[in-house]
Regions:
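Serine-hydrolase catalytic machinery in alpha/beta-hydrolase-like enzymes
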Residues: 7-107, 199-203
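Short beta-to-alpha linker loops that shape the active-site pocket of alpha/beta-hydrolase fold enzymes
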Residues: 65-69, 144, 194
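Primarily recognizes the serine-hydrolase "nucleophile elbow" in alpha/beta-hydrolase
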Residues: 96-155
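Conserved serine/cysteine hydrolase catalytic core
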Residues: 146-156, 166, 221-225, 232
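Short beta-strand/loop motif that positions the catalytic acidic residue
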Residues: 159-162
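Acidic catalytic loop of the alpha/beta-hydrolase fold
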Residues: 164-170
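Short alpha-helix in the alpha/beta-hydrolase fold that links the catalytic acid
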Residues: 170-179
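C-terminal catalytic histidine-bearing segment of alpha/beta-hydrolase fold enzymes
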Residues: 180, 185-233
Length: 233
């Protein structure tokens, strides 16, 4: 599929965020997707995922939450905010601003939007969804759950992928139980033998092609049901 890609910049409060936007050629409207990066920031791997989702029919925006700031300081602030008050910190505010920008694009159907996040980005996707009802579905990868855990009852549908050889596996198990309890549509899978960052081909010691491709197919199917199939209002 032919794609349109561009670098973008937009406001979040009194600062500017940057990102990489990819969508299929044409006017749309396309379902929108925010791609949230790992602790490494907006890398070429995150741009790859934005392009891959665009090739599947989405208008995808990979945001750089570390724009113009020290990566180490941003990582510390993000993780501290998630641990201490995970539903009210700068990362969530920046993601809301990112979705505002995405929804403002004429090619995007604002009634069909979701998010995918990896590592830190997956944890942020879960926390963000608890605080923003615009999201129709999210796909966290090797993510942790927000506090308090009761916040999970406000989640949208979730398709989560977790490596068996990682501390986040227990978070996936807890999320599965909570979503069952709250009656929220979900598909949580733990991949035995897989390691943290199993979807990142740049992490040669962690990449697991079988887990990466299986999770990709699961995410596409789940998003197809909960995002793409939603009627445009």
């Amino acid at each position: 599929m032919a794609l349109v890609t561009k670098n973008v910049s937009f406001a979040s409060g009194n600062r500017q965020l940057e990102g990489f936007f990819a969508q299929p050629e044409g006017e749309g409207p396309f379902p929108g997707l925010v791609v949230i990066h790992e602790v490494w920031g907006l890398t070429e791997n995150m741009r790859y995922w934005a392009r891959r989702f665009a090739d599947a029919g989405y208008a995808a925006l990979a945001v750089d939450l570390f724009t113009g700031r020290s990566k180490a300081i941003c990582m510390f602030r993000m993780m501290s905010g998630m641990l201490l008050n995970s539903l009210n910190h700068q990362g969530i505010a920046d993601l809301k601003a990112t979705l505002n920008f995405l929804e403002a694009q004429p090619s995007v159907d604002r009634e069909r939007v979701g998010a995918v996040g990896y590592c830190m980005g997956g944890s942020l996707a879960i926390a963000w969804s608890c605080a923003d009802n615009r999201l129709k579905a999210i796909a966290p990868y090797y993510a942790t759950n927000p506090k308090p855990q009761e916040a999970l009852k406000r989640l949208c549908p979730v398709v989560g992928s977790y490596p068996g050889k990682d501390f986040t596996a227990k978070h996936g198990q807890q999320l599965d139980i909570a979503l069952d309890q709250y009656g929220i549509a979900h598909d949580i899978k733990i991949y035995p033998g897989a390691k943290h960052a199993f979807c990142n081909e740049d992490r040669k010691n962690a990449y697991n092609q079988d887990a990466a491709e299986d999770s990709w197919e699961r995410v596409l199917a789940f998003f197809g049901e909960h995002i793409q199939s939603k009627a445009t209002v």
